[in-house]
Each structure stands twice: as C-alpha cells, then as structure tokens.
C-alpha cells in the first residue's frame, strides 16, 4: 500500500534536483546564451521574490496567484513556489508548488526587442 502512495505522488510531482532550482543555478555564459549575466541576475532576484524594474511581468506573474506588492515590487508568498530551470535554459522557468512539487506552469522568458537590458516574461499555466 505504501508503494502505491509513493507512485501516485511521484506521478503528480515535477521531477527536478536542487541543482535545477534557479536560486542554486550557477551562471554560465556558454550554457545560458543568449542571456547575459544581468538577465540571469534579474531572474535570480525573481526567484527570491524581487521583481526587477526592467522586468515587465506583474500581470503575468499574477496568473500563478503570486501576491505582489506593487510599491515594493515584491512577491510576498514567494516561498510557496520553486523556480526550476532545466539544462541552463533560462528561456523556460518552471513554476512548481514548493509543498507538493506539482508543476503549476512555466514562465516564457525572452529578450526585449528594443531594450537589451530588459526581459519580457509571459506565463503559461499547466493544464
């Protein structure tokens, strides 16, 4: 019976290691290309709840039920979520429920067309 419970949990859980967590991911210019160090820093801040002023994604982030303080540009319930990056691909940041490890969706990250310092983020919810 215990095995059945473990398998059920494993089927619903998004599989990743602590090395895949954005907050633990080291930057590598060759692996994270075309993203630069400052883009990586903006995403790393996001994983800690801070929304950089060059990231226009407040409405998109709300799709995940993030509680956002617009004045401070801070996600107050960020500890309820994990941000996962697989294979150093910063263009897709998976959003996972920290408690259940269930994938809630992902953030599509791209470079801004006219501002090389900024990121464009859109959210895709899991089905």
Curated annotation (Swiss-Prot):
Pfam families, A to Z: DUF424 (PF04242)
Superkingdom as given in the UniProt entry: Viruses
Protein name: Uncharacterized 14.4 kDa protein
Source species of the chain: Orgyia pseudotsugata multicapsid polyhedrosis virus
